[in-house]
Amino acid sequence: KLGVDVLVTSTQKALALPPGMAVCTLSQKAYERTASVPNRGCYFDLRSIYDTIQKKDYQYTNTPCVSIMYAMDLQLQRIMQEGVENRFARHEAMAEFVRSWADEYFSVFANRDHLSRTLTVISNTRDIDIAALNNVLIERGMQLGNGYGDLKNKTFRIAHMGELTMDDMRSITSNIVDILKLK
C-alpha cells in the first residue's frame, strides 16, 4: 500500500512491549534483490533467514524471545480492536497536544516539516535541570527522556505512542508545570 520494500522495527516503541525483539518484513521485490547482494553476512541475511523459516515450518534460525512473541500476539489483537487508523489518530492528537504545550512553555526542537507522531523533542529554553525534574516525575509515576549526546540537557523528550492516552499527556505536562512553577 505504501510502497515500502523493507520494514524493520522493534517491540518496545509504538507496539508498547518490552524490548528484546526486532520485527522485519520484506516485499517480494526486496526478497528477489537479496539474491544479488554479495557478502550478506549472517545476522542481516534476510534471504537466508526467510528461506530457513519457510523450509522449517516457521522455525526461526535463532531462538526467539517467545514471551515477547505471545505478548505481541495479544498486543496486535488490541491494536486491531482499536483500529490502526484510530491508533494513529490518537497518537497524532497526543502529539499535537504536546507540541502546543511545548510551544507555550518551551519550544519544539524539530523542524515543523519533520515532526514525529510518536515522540516530541522539546528545546530546554528555560535551562531547567532535566535530571532533577525527572527525579520528581519518577516519584509521581511518570518519566521523560533527556536529550542524547550534545543535546543532553539542551532537549528533553515526551513520548506519545503505544498505550499512552491523552490523560497521560495532560498528566505529565501539568506535572511539569507544577514542579517547575511555570506560569
Predicted regions and their residues:
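Conserved active-site segment immediately N-terminal to the catalytic lysine
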Residues: L2-Q12
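Active-site C-terminal subdomain of aminotransferase-like
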Residues: L15-R99
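Short beta-strand-to-loop capping motifs
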Residues: L26, I122-R126, H160
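Conserved PLP-binding catalytic core of the aspartate aminotransferase-like
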Residues: E92, V108-L137
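Short amphipathic alpha-helices in soluble, non-transmembrane regions
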Residues: A132-E139, I172-V177
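Conserved PLP cofactor-binding pocket of PLP-dependent enzymes
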Residues: R140-R157
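PLP-dependent enzyme catalytic core of the Aspartate aminotransferase-like
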Residues: K154-K183
